[in-house]
Structures are given as C-alpha cells and as structure tokens.
Amino acid sequence: MTAELQAASGGPGGLEADCQVLNKMKEITGIQDADFLHAALKAAKGNLMEALIVLTEERDQEPVQNTAAAEPSSWEGSAVGKEPPQGGAAFDPEKKGDVHSAVAYGQLESPKAHAAERPQEVHSPEHKNRSKRKRCEVWGENSKQSDWKRVGDWPVGMKNIGNTCWFSAVIQSLFQLPQFRRLVLSYSFPPNVLESCRTRTGKRNIAFMQELQCLFALMLGTRRKFVDPSAALELLRDAFKSTEEQQQDVSEFTHKLLDWLEDAFQLAVNVRSPGDKSENPMVQLFYGTFLTEGVHEGNTFSKIETFGQYPLQVNGYRNLNECLEGAMVEGEMDEETATQSVKYVQERWFTKLPPVLTFELSRFEFNQSLGQPEKIHTKLEFPQTIFMDRYLYCSKELIQTKREEMKKLKEKMLVLQQKLERYMKYGSGPARFPLPDMLQYVLEFITTKPAGAVSSACVSSTEDSQMMDRQSQGESLILGTPSQPDSMLDGKDGKPEDEAVLLANSSPQQQLNAPLQPSEPPAEMSDCPAPHVVSEEEMNLVTTCLQRWRNEIEQDVRDLKESIARVSLSIDEMYSDPHLQQVPYHLHAVLVHEGQANAGHYWAFIYDQPRKSWLKYNDISVTESSWEELERDSFGGLRNASAYCLMYISDKVSHVVAGEGDGSEVGQFQKEVEALPPELRRYIQEDNWRLEQEAEEWEEEQSCKIPSTASESQELSPESGLDPPAAHEQSLRSLSSEHAMIAKEQTAKAIANAANVYEKNGVEAALCEAFHEEYSRLYLLSKETPTPQNDARLQHVLVYFLQNDAPQQIVERTLLEQFADKNLSYDERSISIMKVARDKLKEIGPDEVNMEEYKKWHEDYSLFRKVSVYLLTGLELYQNRKYKESLTYLIYAYQSNTTLLKKGANRGVNESLITLYRRKCLLKLNEVASSLFVSCEEAHVAEGISILNELIIPCMHLINNFDISREDMDAIEVMRNRWCSYLGREDMDASLQIRLGELLPRLLDGSTEVVVLKEPPKIRPNSPYDLCSRFAAVMESIHDASTVTVK
C-alpha cells in the first residue's frame, strides 16, 4: 500500500479478535471462512490493518484464477498471483472452499438481520441516513418526464418498496413467459366459489391472484416507465408476520408465491375435478417428477417424487452439468467391484420434465460458529442451452455406460498428469523445476567460457532459458498442474530479509524464475559462472549426452501433453452424442443476488425473444444487456454478485415465445390488452388517465421555473464565447459549424495571409491558397511531439482528426466548412471567400463524404473538449482545495473519457492523470467527511454524513462499475477501514454509533447502485488559446508542486 494511502487511513493500531471484528473483516474482504480470518488476525498479532492488507493480497489472486468470468483489469493481467508475506505464510486460499458444508438459503436485508450480524449496531426506524439502498429513487424535484414515462413498447420496471427487489426479479421473469401471463390474466372462477370459500387462506390466495392480475394488466398496457406492486406485496408480507416477526428468506418467499398461485388455480379446478392436481395449470407448467433408485443397507428401493424448483448445490462444482450430475448421483463406488460396473448408493432420473424448468442454486450456508448465514461466492458456469437427455430415465442404460467410461478416463487423466508433474517438478529437494530446463541450464553452464569471454552471450542464454521456463510453466498451468513448489509458497528459502520482501511482492512466476536470474554483479565479478577447467573431449561428451537426454525428455513431455489433450477431449465430448441432444432447454431468465447473506440486492436477466437480446431488469430500470454482462454478473467468483436461480424453458415453449416475437411486441401487447376482461381494461385506462393528470401538474410546476432556468443556461453555455442572445442560435447549428466558429480567429488569419493572392488572382485562388496554407500549418502542428504542458488537439479540430487518422474526405470538408462559416463576415474579401467556399460545399455529393461518419467525428471532438474542460476545472478546484466540486468534475471527465478511449488511444486525454487526482480528491474528501463526523457537533456531523452519502459512496460505486485499478481498490479499502475503525470507540456518542451502523452497509457493499450524480455546471472557454493556456498553467503547476509522477 502506498504511503499516500497509509497517511489517509487514520485508523487505530489494533482491535480485539472478537466476533464483531471477524464480521467486519468478512464484509470488507468478501472472505466468508471465519477460521481463515481468525488465523489472519492472529498472524498479524491483532493488528486489523495488517491482517486486511494480507487478506486483500490473497483475494487479488482470485480474478486471475477465474479469467473466463470477466476481463481482467489493467493491473491483473501481468501476474498469476501474489505470494503472501512471511507473516501470512500459514494461510492457504485453496482451503477456503473446504469449510463450506451445509447449504442454506440467503435472507432478505432487514434491521433484524443486521442486528444479528452486527450486535453493536442499533437501527432507527426512520433510516434517516439511507442505511437501506433504495435503488428506485432516481427521480426527484428536477426529474424529467422521460424518467417516469414509458417509451414505446419497452418493458416496464417495478418500484422497489423497501427491500423488495427480489419480488421484481421473480415477477418479471414470470411475466415474460406468455403462457404464465395468460394464465394469470385469464384467471376466473364462478361467484359461488368465493362465497363458499370460508377459510382465511383461500380468501387470501384469491385476493393475491386478483392483485397479481391488476399488476400484470398494468405491465401490459401502462404508459408509465415502472409499476407499483405495493398491494400484492402487502399480502405476501402479512402472511409471514409471526409473533417473533422473524425475517424469512427469499427462497421461502418465492416458494410461497408459487404455492399461493397453485392453490388459487386449484380452487377453480376443483369446480370441475375436485382434488385433481394434474389439471392444475401451475402444476402442468412448473412441476415435474423424478424417480429415485438406490440401495439402503443392502435393500433396493424406488420411489417417484414431484419437484418444482429443483435445488442444486454449488460448492465443489464448476458448471451446471456438474451440479446436476452431483444431484442425480449420490454415494460412493464399491472398491471390490472397481474393475466391473460402478455401484452407487442412490441415483435419480427425471421421468417428466416441466415446460419451465427452474434450478435453485444454493449459494448460502449457515455458519454454526457465528450463528448466521454466509454466502458462497465461488464461480459456477451455465450454458444458454442445456440438453436434459443425460438425466432422463429413458437414457439410463446409456448414461450408466458413459459414467463408467468417464471414470476410467478420469483415472487415466490422473495418471498422465502425475507422470507429467514428475517431469515439470523435478528434484529431490524442496525447490523443484522443469527437467528439460534444468538440463538446458547445465548445458549452458558447460558451454560458457571463463572470464574474459563475451558476456552478452551469457545474458542472452540466460534470457532464453528464462523464456523457455516461462513457457513450460505456462503449459503446466494450462494443464492444471501446479507450477510452484510448496516451499516457495511458504517463503522458507532462508534468503536475506530484503530478498524475501522482493519475493513477497512479485508474482509466483517471477519467484519461480528468481533463483535462475543473474543478479546485478559487482564491477570486479562481471562474468557468468563457468567451468574452471574443461577439455574439448569432456565438453563434447557432456554436451552430446545432455542434448540427447533433453531431446528424449522433451519428446516424452510432448507425448504426455498430447495424451492428456486427447483424454481431455474425450471427457469433454463424452455427452456430445446426438442421441443425448434431443431434449434441449433454453435459458429464459437468470435471477442474480449481489451482496452478502444478510444484505444485498436482486435483479434479473431475461431473454427477450422479439428483440433477440438479453434485458436487465433492475427495479425500475430495464436496460439492454448482453451475454457477456450476464456472465460477469451471474457466474460469480470475481465480485459478490452471482446467480441464485436459473429458469430454463423447453424447446416447445421457446418456439411459442419466438413465434409470438415475429411481429411487433407492442402490437402483441395491445392484442392481449384488448382481450382482457372489461374491469382490467378499465383499470389500465384509469391508471393512464392519472398519469396524464400527474404529467399536467408536473408541467405546471416546471413552467414556474422556466425563466430562471433559461437565464442560467445562457450564462453557462458550453464551449463558446457567445453572447446570451446567440445561445438559441448556437443550439440549432451543427457541431461542425460550432467547431468552425471556435476556430474562426485562426481561419480569419489564414484569409488575411492570402490577401496578396486575392488582389492578384481573384477569390477562388485566394481560397485555394488560404486552404492549403492552413492545412499545411495544422498538419505540421499535429506532428509536433506532445509535452505534458501542451496538447495541440485543443487548438484545432483538424489537429485532433489528423492525429487520429480521420479519413481525408472528412478532414478536407471540415476545413472547407471553416472558410464557409458566416461568422467570417469581416470585410469584402472574407465575405467573397465565404461564398465561394459555400458553393464548393454544395458541390460535394453524399457519395464523396459519409455524413454519418462526419457527424460522429465531430461528436467525438466535442466530447474531447468537454472532457478537457472538466479535467482542467477539476484540477484547478483541487489545487484550491475545493474537493467536493473537483470530484464531480473528475468523475464526469473519466466517464466521458472512457467512451473516447474505446475508439483509440489518441481520442481522449491521459486517463492516468484523471484517475490519480480522482483518487487523491476522494481520499481528501473522505478525510474531511470522517473528521466532521467524529467532531460530535451536530452541524458538522450532518455535513460529514451528507458528503459521504451524496459524493463519496456514489463515486465509489461508479469507480467499481469500470475496470478498477489496484490503486483505486486500495483507496476504497482505506476509506472503508477508516469508517470501520470508529466502531466500538468508547469516546464516541451512542447516537453517532447508531448513525455509523446505518451508513456502513452502503459503504461496505461494493455492488453497483443505480447512481445518479448531478452533472457539474458547464464551463465555457473563451477560445482555443484560452483553453490551451489554462491547460499549460495547470500542468506546469502540477509538475512543479507534486512529487507524484503520472505513468
């Protein structure tokens, strides 16, 4: 951790290793193993900061081990992992998964649950400091109609009524199933059924179905951007109230919801066929059966059971097929018959699969020692299409045969890997290395000449051997064999202290190579090691033997790798038999949980058949997504977000949904609305009428604010020196015209320089001369070597285009448009040249210049200028210690700059400069907020909380949304640690402890919120020269005043 971060930490020296501290360490690091955390704290001698540093280094290895889940950040890509310091040598991250055994379901976030997890926290009923994350609150006094009005046929979101994001995820996934949607909307029963239903449960189920009908009707026909599910939720909540008012888990809520629907449909079914559940449409859609066969104490048994949501364990499995295989086969092999068929205690086979197949992933377990649930964050992959043939009873004989084949292949794979490991980890001592490389090193030693020989050959030879060593290690890693000896991981090499520190801060690959790398030799010993005396005959004999042995061993290694590859391919293709691909199920929805067991957020990814794309349903927000984003958020292993429920639909259901998607979705929804009963249609109409009333009232309120808003917009017009009367005119011009106006002084100078040509040869010759002279000037300017104090792109749009290799037609049209700008009406010469330039612009046809591409280039330059202005303003404010204002500018500069850098390195500004000062500003602001909070003065405390809620936490979440760097991650951990250090302080008032307990869940949960950070006021530079002079002044000030170098 850098000195800068250490200076910002400000925490106490140590805390007791009690249950509260372990809970805090779990939330900060994401590690759930209490024994592992306790060992870390003990090794750090009770120092919480040292323990967190070690744990953070251990945790940083995980993204590299699971690179398939997400793209690595810039600091992750260069190393396989980090070796722990000597103080933490006893920790083994691989042992984390062994602790998890029993799996329980995760609970919803609640004050009671927080109290169980953090005994020191006291929760007030009002939650004044937003201890609960209300992600739906993106509207407010200054919201626009677009924030709450539906756009076209886009699906609607669902309002979060206080920790009800799980309900939105479940209901949205069910609503997007046409069969289920129609079942709910067409639900009806004779009036006498309601009269004869006297039980409270029956009446409640009917009431819930009626509320769900109204909700689904609104989701079809509303003009709102999101709907309010309060009525249906109240019925659910009332059903779970008990004398102890305990919080129920999400899975139980979901099961109860489906049970109520089933019971409601059964009331209607009983009118025709009393007691016949097979006619229940919910059973037909969501329920299947499986056969359990096995042997218990020597006796065989067989039974058929019904299932709805099928539970699957996650721990110990890599993908969904492995989970299913583990669930279908339980028991151990009979060793006496190992050479014969494989015997299992119990096997399950699906005898009937439902059209909608739901898998419930058990990602929660109950920790008996802590007395609270914990979440399992391990990675689990699942496919978009899964073939269920291998789990069907009709495939039993074929699958049992393949399981025997699979067992033999895995045994063969194990033998081959063990053989290969003997080659790749050769030696009898604690440090072992690849045998081919060891022979190569000996060969290099033999052939090295004594002192006085050319040293470059020695260096070259050493580099070549290191390269081969890296390649060998990389291959062994790919094949799943360890590439590090245990002694290296334990740090027991007996090296000097400074070398041990170097090893602790290097990657395992670098540590493996460390003994083979030549250290910097002293001046008097500049030669490589070499034999003292060796005859030509001895050298030839040893060289011949070493080369022959090395070739033999390399051939053995290649043969082993080829055999492993063949066996691995056979394993991968074991179930690729066409006979086992007749029952496909397609992924319909993925329900995701983010956070810990007792606190978190839920959302859903649902495949939209009409649009042929994935949509993300996150409370009121419904946005277009991708399979790549779904993988990152759902597979787990990297962050604390992972799927907890998968919903697959059969091929038949998928075809029905796809068939409906052939036409317009809005047309399909309209047809369903027209088919609704009259009372539901009237309900939709009334809600839409209320929306129009609300819109009219909103417009009346906004009309009172128009004068002040207009004057404000004129005062802060972007990027130009226009007077207020010209603001409206500027908004109507294209960006290219705006850029021409910005450069009008330079264009006017070019016209003035062509005055002689104008007098001698006329207007066209003057335009041609001025055009070529200006082009030559800008071209040379674009080729100048940039300096930290000078960015030529700020001077002119064409410099930006030329440095980014814009098409020549776009460059020429842009420059011609500069001379056609009507703002050049200074004199007769300028007006004449302007008219000729305009005529030439009209002659350029659409085939010569792609106007869409032309527009995009000018949009990029406009965004570049905006980023530059925001960056300069942020840096100036930072130097003036106005950290609140500075941070907002820097955050917006980074977000816009990221968009530009995706198109090319020269499209945006120096990203490292923005991230450095954004980080420094955030740390300074956190220091200010925390100091205000502990001041015990109410006004200062309120201000500190306001800074934390409105700036620091939103900015932390925005940083997490991008590829976060190691420095940013360390900074976030430092800020969290500072606030955690205030827990349990005796000198802090009890009311402050309550407020702190309410703030910490949002601060510690690194999940992505729907963050709406108000954009800062726009700043207008008077001219390009003004912008360049400000840039030079700020950069000169930074480099003179700061010792931090920007890489």
Curated annotation (Swiss-Prot):
Gene3D superfamilies according to UniProt: Cysteine proteinases, DNA helicase RuvA subunit, C-terminal domain
Cellular component annotations (GO), alphabetically ordered: cytosol; nucleoplasm; nucleus
Residue stretches of biased makeup (Polar residues): 461-486, 504-516, 705-717
Compartments (UniProt record): Nucleus, Nucleoplasm
Domain UIM: 94-113
Basic and acidic residues biased stretches: 111-128, 489-498
Region called Disordered, residue ranges: 60-95, 110-138, 461-528, 694-735
Active site residues according to the UniProt entry: 165 (nucleophile), 601 (proton acceptor)
Top-level taxon: Eukaryota
Pfam families from the UniProt entry: UCH, USP_UIM_N
Entry's family note: Belongs to the peptidase C19 family. USP28 subfamily.
Function: Deubiquitinase involved in DNA damage response checkpoint and MYC proto-oncogene stability. Involved in DNA damage induced apoptosis by specifically deubiquitinating proteins of the DNA damage pathway such as CLSPN. Also involved in G2 DNA damage checkpoint, by deubiquitinating CLSPN, and preventing its degradation by the anaphase promoting complex/cyclosome (APC/C). Specifically deubiquitinates MYC in the nucleoplasm, leading to prevent MYC degradation by the proteasome.
Protein name (database record): Ubiquitin carboxyl-terminal hydrolase 28
Organism: Gallus gallus
